[in-house]
Curated annotation (Swiss-Prot):
Residue ranges occupied by any THUMP domain in the UniProt entry: 147-254
Annotated SMART domains: THUMP
Organism (species): Bos taurus
Region listing for Disordered, in residue ranges: 1-38, 74-95, 276-357
Protein task: Functions as a tRNA-binding adapter to mediate NAT10-dependent tRNA acetylation modifying cytidine to N4-acetylcytidine (ac4C).
Residue positions, PTM Phosphoserine: 8, 86, 88, 119, 270
Subunit structure: Interacts with NAT10. Binds tRNA.
PROSITE patterns xrefs: THUMP
Cross-referenced InterPro entries: THUMP_dom, THUMPD1-like
Protein name, as recorded: THUMP domain-containing protein 1
One of the GO BP terms on file: tRNA modification
GO MF: RNA binding
Composition skew (Polar residues), residue ranges: 1-10, 276-287, 298-315
Alphabetical UniProt keywords: Acetylation, Phosphoprotein
Length: 357
């Protein structure tokens, strides 16, 4: 009797599952066989920032990446979907048709997993991550920016920056050091050498220290080849460090200053803007120092992912620069007006900060 009294309130007065629980379970089933659902260590891809319209950003990214991906690697090949059974072969074939349909669904899910470009959850607002498979992200993105830089043809509206991510690891200092020792070898290990800078940005992460990360990475680059030197004005290579939650994204890119920090909105109008600069500013830009433009300022003010009230800080001490360069002073310049490109960027927002070495 007591057991009946305890059970009776449950159907009518017990706690009911919220809608979010059902939606979450449905999403989990929908993602079965679709590859990684979110940004995680061990994948490659392209990190894209946008301005408050992530869905449109994903659409633009697919369109742009497929256009240039087909140009570089050829069109994607998929299984013929017309081979599915029609179901009109009689009742005896119903079981066989159902089995073939299930096999076809499994193949379709496998095909989805092997898609060349696939959007996954980045873990930060106004940031889209497109996982890539079978391509080299840094070469593809460089090809896109090079073409846009030459043609000056604007192909996107909401995409701001497009950064290739050649490798990901756990966002802990020891994991990053161990991973970077082998990751950076193709560019900096003897006999390879070059000038470099380090660009650091963190989102939704509070346990990483930017000074420690920069110091350790600069030390690794210097240990690979003593001839690797820091160049803050026009480096051959830029080491991009993007941290989102507990994942560290790494890449080494070329022409970072020439392509306006890989900003698609700035690349198309850089020539026009340079013609309007005064001789002093033009000379600075010609030497590889980037001048911030009004449109660039507006985009960064409207983009929470890039941070609000950004500042550029030049860490010019021997500890941050590593064994290759030592300078003595530190300058802080507000990022509200046109100015030369400096060594570091630090976003003083609650969720992100950026630092260029």
């Amino acid at each position: 009797m007591a057991a009946r009294i305890q059970q009776s309130p449950q159907p009518g007065g017990g706690k009911r599952k919220g809608k979010a629980q059902y939606v979450q379970a449905k999403r989990a089933r929908r993602w079965d066989g679709g590859g990684p659902r979110q940004l995680e260590p061990g994948i490659q891809g392209i990190l894209i920032t946008c301005n408050m319209n992530e869905r449109k950003c994903v659409e633009e990214a697919y369109s742009l990446l497929n256009e240039y991906g087909d140009d570089m690697y050829g069109p994607e090949k998929f299984a013929d979907k017309d081979q599915q059974p029609s179901g009109s072969e009689g009742e005896d074939d119903d079981v066989e048709a159902a089995l073939k349909k299930e096999v076809g669904d499994i193949k379709a899910s496998t095909e989805m997993r092997l898609r060349r470009f696939q959007s996954v959850e980045s873990g930060a607002n106004n940031v889209v991550f497109i996982r890539t498979l079978g391509i080299e992200p840094e070469k593809l993105v460089h090809h896109i920016l090079q073409d846009i830089y030459k043609t000056k043809k604007k192909k996107t509206r909401v995409i701001l920056r497009m950064l290739p991510i050649s490798g990901t690891c756990k966002a802990f200092l020891e994991d990053m050091k161990k991973y970077a020792e082998t990751f950076l070898e193709p560019w900096f290990k003897a006999p390879n050498k070059g000038t470099f800078q380090i660009v650091y940005k963190s989102r939704n992460n509070s346990h990483m220290n930017r000074e420690e990360v920069i110091k350790e990475l600069a030390g690794i680059v210097g240990s690979l080849n003593s001839e690797n030197k820091v160049d803050l004005s026009n480096p051959q290579y830029t080491v991009v460090v993007e941290i989102i939650k507990a994942v560290c994204c790494l890449s080494v890119v070329k022409d970072y200053m020439l392509f306006r920090k890989y900003n698609l909105q700035e690349v198309v109008k850089s020539a026009k803007d340079l013609s309007q600069l005064n001789p002093k500013q033009a000379a600075q830009t010609g030497n590889g120092k980037e001048a911030k433009l009004e449109s660039g300022d507006k985009s960064s003010q409207n983009d929470p992912a890039e941070g609000k009230n950004n500042q550029q800080v030049v860490p010019e001490n021997s500890e941050e620069l590593g064994p290759t360069e030592s300078i003595s002073e530190t300058h802080v310049v507000n990022e509200g007006v046109a100015k030369p490109e400096l060594a570091s960027q630090v976003t003083e927002g609650s969720e992100s900060n950026e630092n260029d070495l």
